[in-house]
Amino acid sequence: MPVDPEKLAKLQKSTAKKVGGSRVKAKKGVKTEQDDTKLIETLGKLKATKIEGVEEANFFKDDGKVLHFNRVGVQGAPAANTFAFTGYPQEKNITQLIPQILPQLGAENLEILRQLAEQIQAGKNPKDFGAAGEAGATEEANEDIPDLVDQKFDDVE
């Protein structure tokens, strides 16, 4: 009976390999549903309770960006000093949220507020505010662009 080497190679690859008499198990991918159930189980062990009345949450990052949770679920276990925030975060600039988050800003964000105030006093648009390095880069890029107000392009050259 002739044996086709291609079919034989395909069969050998498809069968589970044995190492030391036991089969090698294929790794299963971790799904987010499994992560969620593990998180829920862990919060249950800590006796975390749902905290009502939280409409939004903001996490301030070092680079001046804010993780903004519009609809947030909060569970807390004060005995274990553990709190879980669940929802879909949006990364926003601090200037996009400035009227709503002024009461939430602490001492660590005073430098960002100071930079914003300087930009407003200088007449710049605060929407352009990002990190301090980004503001300097846009100023340098705008220096090369000539003002063409009430002039023709051919006259400038």
Swiss-Prot record:
GO BP, one annotated term: protein transport
GO (cellular component) term, any one: cytoplasm
Principal subcellular localization: cytoplasm
Region called Disordered, residue ranges: 1-31, 125-157
Skewed-composition ranges (Low complexity): 130-139
Subcellular location: Cytoplasm; Nucleus
Lineage: superkingdom: Eukaryota
Transmembrane segments: none
Sorted UniProt keywords: Cytoplasm, Nucleus, Protein transport, Repressor, Transcription, Transcription regulation, Transport
Ranges where the NAC-A/B domain occurs: 33-98
Pfam families found in the cross-reference section: NAC
Classification via SMART domains: NAC (SM01407)
UniProt cross-references to Gene3D superfamilies, sorted A to Z: Nascent polypeptide-associated complex domain
Family classification: Belongs to the NAC-beta family.
Function field: Component of the nascent polypeptide-associated complex (NAC), a dynamic component of the ribosomal exit tunnel, protecting the emerging polypeptides from interaction with other cytoplasmic proteins to ensure appropriate nascent protein targeting. The NAC complex also promotes mitochondrial protein import by enhancing productive ribosome interactions with the outer mitochondrial membrane and blocks the inappropriate interaction of ribosomes translating non-secretory nascent polypeptides with translocation sites in the membrane of the endoplasmic reticulum.
Subunit details: Part of the nascent polypeptide-associated complex (NAC), consisting of EGD2 and EGD1. NAC associates with ribosomes via EGD1.
Protein name, per record: Nascent polypeptide-associated complex subunit beta
Source organism per UniProt: Lodderomyces elongisporus (strain ATCC 11503 / CBS 2605 / JCM 1781 / NBRC 1676 / NRRL YB-4239) (Yeast)
